[in-house]
Curated annotation (Swiss-Prot):
The lineage of its organism: Bacteria, Bacillati, Actinomycetota, Actinomycetes, Mycobacteriales. It comes from the Bacteria. It comes from Mycobacterium sp. (strain KMS). The gene is rph. This is Ribonuclease PH. Phosphorolytic 3'-5' exoribonuclease that plays an important role in tRNA 3'-end maturation. Removes nucleotide residues following the 3'-CCA terminus of tRNAs; can also add nucleotides to the ends of RNA molecules by using nucleoside diphosphates as substrates, but this may not be physiologically important. Probably plays a role in initiation of 16S rRNA degradation (leading to ribosome degradation) during starvation. Signal peptide: none annotated.
Length: 260
């Protein structure tokens, strides 16, 4: 099998690295790297929920995505300077929020909000899928923080892990984890969000330059799910280490041992 421009096989991910505790203030903070794509993902906990959620006893999770002006070769203006958030930014923000809400029991949060912020420091394709993969780890750390603060009605509100990856058809070949040089000329481009239980959260796929048959779709999904399995391993290895900061001290008195 011939190799790609960066030396990888068609079914090979770029080197993936997840660094927890990247910044010190949020409950969860992660730097995720897929090759040259680097995204900072944070999970901040705030008291209260949106107005339409008040009085339900349920929490909420929301997400925002943005790219730094110099994340790509050509600098782009900040959207705050333009005075409006672009359609692509809104779409990806909503995708990240939907993906992470699929794995958490919002009832367990009480009326608290977890705000996910994904900021692309450097873009080389696959920024939204890298953001989802890293944001899950930041979310897991935020849940650990909430548990230590005794704000969870269920100490284990996460039902599964979430990861995402890009797949596509480039030069007639099914490939995974497309860098910009491949993504920009792909005949088929797809993003897949999956759980570690083998189910799908979301599929975004388009024929950029041509239509494609069902058999190609099956190959793309098989490759995406196999690659997500590898990402789940990276996530678990990152989360095996202790929480990378100071946890709040419990406020309730310790329970007395039976018979004491």
């Amino acid at each position: 099998m011939s190799r790609r421009e960066d030396g990888r096989l068609d079914d090979e991910l770029r080197p993936v690295r997840i660094t927890r505790g990247f910044t010190s203030h949020p409950a969860g903070s992660v730097l995720v790297e897929f090759g040259e794509t680097r995204v900072m993902c944070t999970a901040s906990v705030t008291e209260g929920v949106p107005r339409w959620r008040k009085g339900t006893g349920q929490g909420w999770l929301t997400a925002e995505y943005a790219m730094l002006p110099a994340a790509t070769h050509d600098r782009s203006d900040r959207e705050s300077v333009k005075g409006r958030v672009g359609g692509r930014t809104q779409e990806i923000s909503r995708l990240i929020g939907r993906s992470l809400r699929a794995c958490i029991d919002l009832n367990a949060l009480g009326e608290n909000t977890i705000a996910i912020d994904c900021d692309v420091l450097q873009a080389d394709g696959g920024t939204r899928t890298a953001a989802i993969t890293g944001a899950y780890v930041a979310l897991a750390d935020a849940v650990t923080y909430l548990a230590a603060a005794e704000k969870l009605s269920d100490p284990r509100p996460l039902s599964c892990a979430i990861a995402a990856v890009s797949v596509g058809v480039v030069d007639g070949r099914v490939r995974v984890d497309l860098p910009y040089s491949e993504d920009s000329r792909a005949e088929v481009d797809m993003n897949v969000v999956a759980t570690d239980t083998g189910t799908l959260v979301e599929i975004q796929g388009t024929g950029e330059g041509a239509t494609f048959p069902r058999s190609t779709l099956d190959k793309l999904l098989d490759l995406a799910l196999a690659s997500c399995d590898q990402l789940f391993v990276v996530q678990r290895e990152a989360l095996d280490a202790p929480y990378p900061g100071a946890l709040p001290e419990p406020t309730s008195p310790p329970k007395k041992a039976f018979g004491s």
